[in-house]
Amino acid sequence: RIIDSCTYIIGGTGRVKNVIDKNGTHILSPRLTDGGLSITDMGSKIIYDCRTVPVDGDGQYQPTSGFGQGPAVLMVQQDAVEFVLRGRNVFYGFIVACDPWLKAGQTCFIVDEQGALIGHGLAQCDADEALRFRKGIAVRTRSDFSKTFK
């Protein structure tokens, strides 16, 4: 639904460099190193707004969850919100809940306890680790929402 009306910027080698939505907003770019997608701050907002399922807050890990319903969402405690908004990484001890399809190396969205998007980044763990570990970096953030959404 999002990419139906998008335009693409093609580089000199014939590869897609950027994906632009119908309003002219750069929403994502392919990563050549691993084939993943780098989502921009505005792109994360657009994609997150299309989400229809709530974050699974029961804390139960489901190893057979598969691909899920889009990029996984990770919910953090209120204490971590101001740091994530400024582009700081998410540490395990501050995670409240996450989608069961969270996988290491994949893009995920970071939300506060009310479900408001506060950042996005690359997960360093799967859902089981996110809910069980207490020390270390769970998500390396790729945004500074405090500057993007003033």
Predicted regions, residues:
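Polybasic, low-complexity RNA-engagement segments
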Residues: 1-150
